[in-house]
Amino acid sequence: MRVRKRKGAEEHLENNPHYVISNPEEAKGRWHEIFGNNNPIHIEVGSGKGAFITGMAEQNPDINYIGIDIQLSVLSYALDKVLDSGAKNIKLLLVDGSSLSNYFDTGEVDLMYLNFSDPWPKKKHEKRRLTYKTFLDTYKDILPEQGEIHFKTDNRGLFEYSLASFSQYGMTLKQVWLDLHASDYQQNIMTEYERKFSNKGQVIYRVEARF
């Protein structure tokens, strides 16, 4: 979903280089150096306005988080949340999720999150879905052996498609939630969309898949 253009968004990002990495190609292979530690690195592709990535960073200070989004205005709102939180273990990237191997070395990312990705419901747009096989090729490259993807959505069609895509790729479905909020899963951090959809009574689906 597109967000209305935010005045001053570009300047906002430029004025916060500690959090927003302006030349991510130069960071490839150097992420631990950039964070200043050897803690695990988790990324969220399509981080939206930052509720999830910020909440995770606050909950897990010994993990480094990178929020990735292609929309300038959206990322500027995520930066607001990061600044408000004061978390030191977050970086933000304004890049396309299809080109992750340009920014991360092989095995450099320990775990990745896909939350409420665009379902692209039309068959002709299948290749744009973030769980399509060519995206999985990229994810596998930047994750370690047996690296994991944690995926959440409210869209049943996309969820079923993604389960099939993961399985056909040879991935292991570690755990599947058909109604996350009705489960006893305690570690959930909600995204903005998740809270909105949940308040409307929509079921939230989740899966942890391992290469």
Swiss-Prot record:
S-adenosyl-L-methionine binds at E44, D69, D96, D118. Residues 124-129 are annotated as: Interaction with RNA. The active site is at D118. It catalyses: guanosine(46) in tRNA + S-adenosyl-L-methionine = N(7)-methylguanosine(46) in tRNA + S-adenosyl-L-homocysteine. It comes from the Bacteria. InterPro entries: SAM-dependent_MTases_sf, tRNA_(Gua-N-7)_MeTrfase_Trmb, tRNA_methyltr_TrmB_bact. CDD domains: AdoMet_MTases (cd02440). Its EC number is 2.1.1.33. NCBIfam families: PRK00121.2-2, tRNA (guanosine(46)-N7)-methyltransferase TrmB. HAMAP family: tRNA_methyltr_TrmB. Catalyzes the formation of N(7)-methylguanine at position 46 (m7G46) in tRNA. Belongs to the class I-like SAM-binding methyltransferase superfamily. TrmB family. This is tRNA (guanine-N(7)-)-methyltransferase. It comes from Streptococcus agalactiae serotype V (strain ATCC BAA-611 / 2603 V/R). The gene is trmB.
